[in-house]
Amino acid sequence: MARTRNRLDRTPFQTAVTDLSHDGRGVARRDGEGGKVTFISGALPGELVRAEPTARSRHFDEAKTVEVLEASPQRVTPRCPHFGVCAGCVLQHLEESQQIVAKQRVLMDNLERIGHVTPQAVLPALTGDNWGYRRKGRFSVRRVEKKDKTLVGFRELDPRFVADLSICYTVIPQIGEKIPLFAALIEGMDGKRDIPQIEFIAGDDAVALTIRHMQPLSERDRQAWVAFAQEHGFAIFLQPGGVDSVHPLWPQDVPLSFRLPQWEVELAFRPLDFIQVNASLNQKMIAHAVALLEAKPDDRVLDLFCGLGNFTLPLARVVREVVGVEGDAGLVARAKENAQRNGLDNAQFHAADLTQDQRSAPWMRQGFDKLLLDPPRSGALEVLQQLPLKTFDRIVYVSCHPGSLARDAGYLVNDQGFTLVCAGAMDMFPHTAHVESIAVFERR
């Protein structure tokens, strides 16, 4: 006889919320469950809520708030009508000034719990634009036959579903206010079932959409996108396959770039390239990192995971030489072009997979005074274990994941004898639980 899985009891329960998790959910311990931890979406520390169970596991349960019985004084009314359904933002119900406080707390907790390190000083949080800041992103697209409509938006909190967005306030207004127009255009296409996603990216002077399509577009559909682009001021790219298949539909020549006025630098990029999503925070972050590095005119600096040269080229304005290393060969090619375009002949770039053995690479043996790195979520442990770390007087580590930063900080401090001078959060993604941070290490 086949075993049947126990059905989840969704009876709402009342509980006190004591903390905020790293992903922005309230944390509660249910006495009736032996003190088992429950993560509750939409709940804040200090609140008494009624919550409905949504999932159970051996070590913790999950639930969603159905009623706030006693509200936190830090609770605010979310601006977005889709809050609580869309997973794009999970902290809109928390006062903006407290969001970054929570992120600082997540960072410090990770450093202590995972890395077993404590910074000598906590840096003041870095903040930028809180609304309309997101200049790069990806919308999912889904034709829902039962609703007889096309949905365009971010994923819902239940990632099986696409949020049916009417607006998004965190995305730049040129995009966030036009989401229903995207859905209407796709709904009218011959190939409306063949569009799985739309990517958007904005430079200082142009906004580009990349349309992923699983089947060739009909001429009628192509002309519909061209007309849409002309009416609303977009550049349209098509992506029938992998990244290399991206090509312009209209216009044929689209200059995409952003400027860093403090450094007299302009960075050109392509539609699917990585750029920092928050333009105002990015400019502050670069200035912050350069200052924390204490870069001097005679310094030679190594910039790992350099991308388009976001840090490399500003550094080239203030140091003798800077070498950028990046795993994406396309980004390296663009970085070299950017250096040439900006008249910076003291910036070199190399393509290298920094998760693999690079000890014989020529750039590894050049000799540097300082190190700046901005790795992906997985961190930089593999390359840190290969570098001649004792040659660096100072390291500035920009992180997009506090857990991997904490692990790498533990290695630098506890295994390699560095001091964690300071660390602090940076609010690259306001209203989300994403924690961007920066840390400074000094050789003892």
UniProtKB/Swiss-Prot annotation:
The active site is at C400 (nucleophile). Pfam families: tRNA_U5-meth_tr. GO terms for molecular function: 4 iron, 4 sulfur cluster binding; iron ion binding; RNA binding; rRNA (uridine-C5-)-methyltransferase activity. S-adenosyl-L-methionine binds at Q276, F305, N310, E326, D353, D374. It catalyses: uridine(1939) in 23S rRNA + S-adenosyl-L-methionine = 5-methyluridine(1939) in 23S rRNA + S-adenosyl-L-homocysteine + H(+). Belongs to the class I-like SAM-binding methyltransferase superfamily. RNA M5U methyltransferase family. RlmD subfamily. This is 23S rRNA (uracil(1939)-C(5))-methyltransferase RlmD. It comes from Xanthomonas euvesicatoria pv. vesicatoria (strain 85-10) (Xanthomonas campestris pv. vesicatoria).
